[in-house]
């Protein structure tokens, strides 16, 4: 993520998190920085699963930032990618990063005169931005027509790329050790957190 993003907010201030979630959206791993961002990802992942139930496919990618559906602030835009192995949804990779602008009445999203959330930034409820590996250009255009800075498009592509790297690395593990071993270790992790 840090090697592909262009914004100093992400690559220098490190105002982002990454995470790995099981097929149900339960947290398996997350970066240590900014727990407020990281801990908001699991509930959003579950929200996306529910919202798109029956319409989640290999190659899909979702965007989300909506404070009314579990987001923490509109400038923190999350990307989720489902991971399929042998036709089964086994995990999700996710990245959430603070974007320099995501629309709204003033540049940067910090509007001290705002009296409602619509004046702060563009609200992005759970939306499928890539459908089965094909970018939904119409949705992309709608979002970024409302954003002042071109750099945000590059940073969102960096978030998408980081999710793809996470997917690729998890699939390497699954091919090497198998889904049964993954499930055993996943369950051991959940049991350890209960103690």
What are these regions (language model features)?
Residues 35-48, 100-109:
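A short, polar/charged loop-to-alpha-helix boundary motif
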């Amino acid at each position: 993520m840090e090697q592909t993003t262009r914004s100093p907010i992400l690559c220098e201030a490190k105002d982002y998190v990454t995470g790995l979630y099981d097929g149900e959206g339960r947290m398996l791993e997350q970066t240590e920085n900014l727990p407020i961002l990281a801990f908001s990802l699991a509930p959003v992942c579950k929200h996306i699963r529910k919202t798109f139930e029956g319409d989640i496919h290999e190659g899909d990618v979702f965007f989300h930032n909506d404070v009314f559906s579990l987001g923490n602030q509109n400038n923190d835009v999350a990307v989720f990618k489902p991971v399929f192995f042998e036709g089964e949804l086994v995990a999700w990779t996710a990245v959430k990063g603070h974007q320099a602008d995501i629309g709204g009445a003033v540049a940067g999203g910090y509007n001290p005169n705002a009296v409602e959330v619509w004046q702060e930034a563009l609200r992005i409820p759970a939306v499928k931005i890539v459908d089965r590996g094909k970018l939904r250009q119409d949705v992309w255009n709608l979002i970024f027509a409302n954003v002042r800075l071109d750099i945000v498009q590059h940073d969102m592509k960096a978030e998408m790329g980081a999710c793809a790297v996470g997917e690729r690395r998890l699939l390497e593990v699954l091919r090497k050790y198998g889904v049964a071993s993954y499930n055993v270790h996943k369950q051991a992790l959940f049991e350890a957190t209960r103690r």
